[in-house]
């Protein structure tokens, strides 16, 4: 018997405070100061109160000691007790014969309780307690008499009351000052956050991406610097987007205009009563239309590749570069069967975007084939340079690239004066650069034959990865985070690919010689 599924318990959303950060900082400072003030006030009140009560006890003991040691209680007890009336204490002397001598302050009487009675009866020698707002000391003397002295606590209570009032006022002022200071500190400290907020709102409303001034070197200053970096990145992104749209529009306009002209001419020639164009011209127009459509398709495909890489969401997998080179060579050979390809490729695996790597290699080979003269040779070499890097070199025997233009050839839509007469979108090498950098590689351009005529062009692409050993599955140690762990039988596949490239190479050489 299966139980029905239990409904999932959703956690209630957390309550978020509606108070601003400034108010929260101020309230926090005020609360902390209030807590400290309360603790300090309680401590001060307790210490002062204890000191005052100890002082009263000391006074009572001193008076009793003075009366006892002076001998006046034995000589003239009545006079001795009456003399205390001129001080601030109440006194009583109880003799064994039950004669009692008292002297009280105006409006006061010395209270007698169980403790005092025990002292008078001799059960206790000393008693000290508080009763009826008085501090009472009872002492049993050696002659059997008992001396009782008390002091009013009213003056002490007044002092403690004034102390409590002062502490309350001082504490309240301290809390108020803490609240004001906390508000000022929060306002000053959060001023950079306010500037960041205003800048973010300004960016959301307008296209104003001006950086924010940075003051100091604290955490808020670093936050401002990070925000400025984000603004600069956003500015560059918008500039690249605007430049891409502008360049794409310009590049699309030319083939579209030519295509429209040719289509309109073909339509006009087919209109009733219109003069017929010669068949040769019609065939030329149709060929131009097909070529222009292919040019548009290539341009749109390159744009899609660029935007796909920038948008992200690419699936990474283990890519065998030997297979990528092999497939790219097959496509290029179909377009240029009049040139020779000299291929030397080792087994090498890269963890990355398979489609992007294939497009980058194809663009390099297409570029080399496009600039190679009939009967020329294109070199393709993939060699391992260190345990975790391999270098792909694509060389041609073309006119070469001037040193001043070598950095520009990787820019979008850049085409040199010599390249404008050749087919292409100006995006191929830009895609190569984007793919290589995305995979943590590097690339450079050099002459194939420095000082030669023609010098040719060689593209060097460095890619991180790991090798495949021919005839086995051993591999060099590489960081595990970069690659898939399952690499079984990889070496044998690499061996077969190298043989296949060599055989195909031989066929291309013989074919080129026959041509």
UniProtKB/Swiss-Prot annotation:
Q: Which residues carry this modification: Phosphohistidine?
A: 250
Which PROSITE patterns did the record assign? Answer: HAMP, HIS_KIN
Q: Give this protein's Gene Ontology molecular function annotations.
A: ATP binding; phosphoprotein phosphatase activity; phosphorelay sensor kinase activity
Q: Do you know which CDD domains this protein is assigned to?
A: HAMP (cd06225), HATPase (cd00075), HisKA (cd00082)
List UniProt keywords, sorted A-Z.
ATP-binding, Cell membrane, Hydrolase, Kinase, Magnesium, Manganese, Membrane, Nucleotide-binding, Phosphoprotein, Protein phosphatase, Stress response, Transferase, Transmembrane, Transmembrane helix, Two-component regulatory system, Virulence
Query: Which InterPro entries does the record match to this protein?
Result: 2C_sensor_his_kinase, HAMP_dom, HATPase_C_sf, His_kinase_dom, HisK_dim/P_dom, HisK_dim/P_sf, Sig_transdc_His_kin-like_C
According to UniProt, the name of this protein is: Signal transduction histidine-protein kinase/phosphatase MprB
